Design a protein with these regions (language model features):
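Catalytic cores of soluble metabolic enzymes centered on carboxylation/carboxyl-transfer
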Residues: 3, 21, 38, 42-278, ...
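Active-site phosphate-binding and catalytic loops of NTP-dependent enzymes
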Residues: 8-15, 62-70, 300-301
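Conserved metal-phosphate-binding beta-hairpin within the catalytic cores
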Residues: 12-38
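Long, charged amphipathic helices and adjacent flexible linkers at domain junctions
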Residues: 69-75, 185, 190, 318-343
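Structured, non-catalytic alpha/beta "coupling" segments that mediate domain-domain communication
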Residues: 80, 90, 295-324
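A conserved acidic, glycine/proline-rich C-terminal tail/linker
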Residues: 279-297
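Structured functional modules or segments
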Residues: 331-410
Length: 410
């Protein structure tokens, strides 16, 4: 009623959003009116069954408002989350970059996805970093929460950091579930909501290792000699040894934990020695990122997105991030070195940590670029040697400019 009174007082006709702020005693106070459709218009549309964008076009074309307020009924409950390319762990600093993997829930009754981003698109630093909206409807708030949880479980993004994990934590928090929240909710529950990811389980490590082995096999399948003998050493991917099983080591990083997974090649699969167990694994790639596998006798379907030396894994709706070390970088790090050593956005070089001829290990800090009052670290994508520095401290560089020449060592 207060919103209608405000609109009538200024003879406003069209879509608009009136905002109020409420106190704990349910007193509310006028905040502002935006004379336009807002980001949250989908919530109203789901509750009313009306298309507000269509309304706005019709009104702009001179037509009358399609319905009067008394003709509009509200049904159910709707919740909207905004998916942002940002890093909650660093005070929500924007995370520009290329999107290498994107999988969003599909539209269906009770669920709406607003998105214009595709794999290969760039999230730039010049605009608001929102990349999608997910809106879920239910007969009541409990049903809507269940729907939004399920939708967030199905959301996968790699290449840029996002707030998807934070959103999942919020909608699962008991205080939020019970409606006990306000604008200080995140700060109040920061320790819970921003909790660091738990260490990857052996099952996750096995999935990541299997993915690397399958990708390696796929990568060299066109270069080996086909002898028609599946047990011929010339048909093995790597590490063949006379009179002994072929073995290899896949070197991973889980947060700050270095992990060496010992691999023994066996007919039809691999035997893995993991930190807390050993297991036999086998499987196949389905498309670019999906893996159908048997891990230690457990049949699973997982998703793995490889971006340079970083592995994003989704298993049982949980996202884990592993990094490849040393030889495992041979898959893609060399190909991605150029991208990793170019300026992510226009900015000024503030620090140079290496000189020409410096030999560095993977992950070493090479340069610091300042842009939009934020620092961006330029990291060595693999073990290697700095061949040439193209810029010095104080130099201004344009986006995608190659900052240095680097020779990887695999």
């Amino acid at each position: 009623e207060a919103a209608l009174t405000a609109a009538k007082a200024i003879h406003y006709v069209g879509a608009g959003t009136v905002e109020f702020i409420a106190d704990p005693a349910d007193n509310f106070y006028f905040l502002e009116m935006n004379t336009r459709i807002q980001v949250e218009h989908r919530v109203t549309e789901m509750l009313t069954g009306q298309d507000l964008v269509e309304w706005q076009f019709r009104i702009a074309d001179g037509e009358q408002v399609p319905l009067q307020q008394k003709q509009i009924t509200l049904r159910g409950h709707a919740i909207e989350v905004r998916l942002y390319a940002e890093n909650p762990a660093r005070n929500f600093v924007p995370s520009p970059g290329l999107v290498h993997h994107l999988r969003l829930p599909k539209d269906k009754p009770g669920l709406c996805i607003d998105n214009s981003l595709n794999v290969g698109d760039e999230v730039t630093p010049y605009y608001d970093p929102m990349i999608a909206k997910i809106i879920a409807w239910g007969g009541d708030r409990k049903d809507a929460l269940h729907a939004i949880k399920r939708a967030l479980n199905e959301t996968q993004v790699a290449g840029v950091k996002t707030n998807v994990q934070l959103l999942s934590q919020i909608v699962r928090h008991p205080e939020f579930r019970d409606g006990n929240y306000n604008t200080g909710f995140i700060a109040l529950h920061q320790d819970t909501l921003m909790a660091q990811s738990v260490s990857a389980s052996d099952l996750v490590l096995a999935l990541g290792t299997l993915f690397i082995l399958l990708k390696r096999k796929e990568k060299i399948s066109g270069t080996v000699v086909d002898t028609k003998d599946p047990y011929s050493p010339w048909n093995e991917e790597d590490s063949w040894r006379l009179n002994l099983p072929a073995q290899d080591v896949i070197q991973l990083m889980d947060g700050g934990r270095e992990i060496d997974v010992e691999v023994t090649f066996i007919p039809g699969g691999y035997h893995l020695s993991l930190p807390n167990s050993s297991m036999t694994v086998s499987g196949a790639l389905v498309g670019e990122s999906d893996v159908e596998a048997i891990l230690g006798g457990i049949q699973i379907k997982g998703t793995v997105a490889l971006n340079g030396h970083e592995l994003n894994l989704w298993l049982y709706d949980v996202n884990h991030i592993l990094k490849l070390r040393d030889r495992a970088l041979a898959l893609d790090a060399v190909a991605d070195t150029v991208d990793n050593l170019s300026a992510p956005m226009p900015g000024r070089i503030t620090q140079v940590m290496v000189g020409e001829g410096t030999v560095v290990r993977s992950g070493a800090l090479l340069m610091v670029l300042e842009a939009m009052k934020m620092e961006h670290n330029i990291i060595a994508p693999s073990n290697g040697k700095v061949e040439k520095l193209n810029f010095s401290v104080g130099d201004w560089v344009d986006e995608n400019t190659m900052l240095l020449d680097f020779s990887p060592v695999i």
